[in-house]
Amino acid sequence: MRKSKVETAKTRERIVKAAGAEFAANGISEAALARVMASAGLTHGGFYRHFVSKDQLVLEACSKTLLSLVASLELLVNRKPREQALPLLVDHYVSRAHRDQPRTGCPLAALGSELARRDKRTRHVAMQGFLQLSRLIASHLETVPFRKRAERSMAIVSAMVGAVTLARIAPDSPISDSVLVATRDYIIRSVRRHR
């Protein structure tokens, strides 16, 4: 019996979600398609009914994960007082929880160096996600002069991604926690200086 278009779309969505988690946890090159499909509750043989290649799956998983991340961060600060929004965003992203759970975190922090070596379309999707995160941060930089918000927000997102990436190198080390704390403090102090 053939699946309906709705069922096929739901299955594809499950594969993309499983792939995003698998890539973030194990790296793109280490994530076998058989493991991705098993994580989605499917057999390896069904992969090519949904995707032309692993590259196509990487592109879609990166896009979907970044869109979900930005949406969840927007929801996190929705209806919060302006002065609490930026610290809340920074604390949430640059955290032990994010460091310790790469499967559910930002693909830029989990896969940055691998994404840099992917095809042009995938790099474009990754940069669009970076820019969306930057725009979200910029929207909460009311103490920074308007003309400097874009560049400041890009620097902040770069620091956030870098901190989580570095903290994951030695997650059981006191240095790991220090990197997270120092980066959070530095970002918030640097923004407050521009009042």
Regions found by a protein language model. Give the residues of each.
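Solvent-exposed, amphipathic alpha-helical segments
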Residues: 14, 18-25, 72-75, 159-166
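Hydrophobic alpha-helical connector segments
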Residues: 60, 74-105, 153-156
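N-terminal intrinsically disordered/low-complexity leader segments
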Residues: 1-10, 193-195
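Short, basic, alpha-helical segments at the C-terminal edge of helix-turn-helix-like DNA-binding modules
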Residues: 63-68
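Hydrophobic/aromatic-rich alpha-helical bundle segments in the mid-to-C-terminal region
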Residues: 119-128, 141-195
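Active-site oxyanion/phosphate-handling segment shared across diverse enzymes
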Residues: 130-140
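Helix-turn-helix
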Residues: 14, 22-56, 60
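Amphipathic alpha-helical segments used for helix-helix packing
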Residues: 84-88, 100-127
